[in-house]
From Swiss-Prot:
It comes from Terrybacteria sp. (strain RIFCSPHIGHO2_01_FULL_58_15). The lineage of its organism: Bacteria, Candidatus Terryibacteriota. This is Prokaryotic ubiquitin-like protein UBact. HAMAP family: UBact (MF_02133). Keywords: Isopeptide bond, Ubl conjugation pathway. One of its GO terms (molecular function) is protein tag activity. Belongs to the ubiquitin-like protein UBact family. It comes from the Bacteria. The keyword Chaperone does not apply.
Length: 70
């Protein structure tokens, strides 16, 4: 009977997911992923979907104001 490491190696070759948890590179921890402000806005958005359009419109107005001010 092959030992566990041997089984692990053959399993990897076959392309089956490893039983050991491997960190996915494209999914960093939340602290790196988004700032607290982003998280807060997202929580608000999830609670009130209608808010999202208003926030985006407000951001666009803000950007336009900044651009015209320059």
């Amino acid at each position: 009977m092959p030992d566990q490491r041997q089984q692990e190696r053959s399993r990897r070759k076959q392309g089956e997911p490893s039983p050991l948890p491997t960190p996915t590179r494209h999914d960093p921890p939340p602290s790196e992923q988004e700032s607290p402000v982003r998280r807060m806005l997202r929580d608000l958005r999830e609670r009130d979907p209608g808010q999202e359009a208003e926030e985006e419109a407000a951001q666009r107005r803000q950007q336009r104001r900044e651009q015209s001010g320059e």
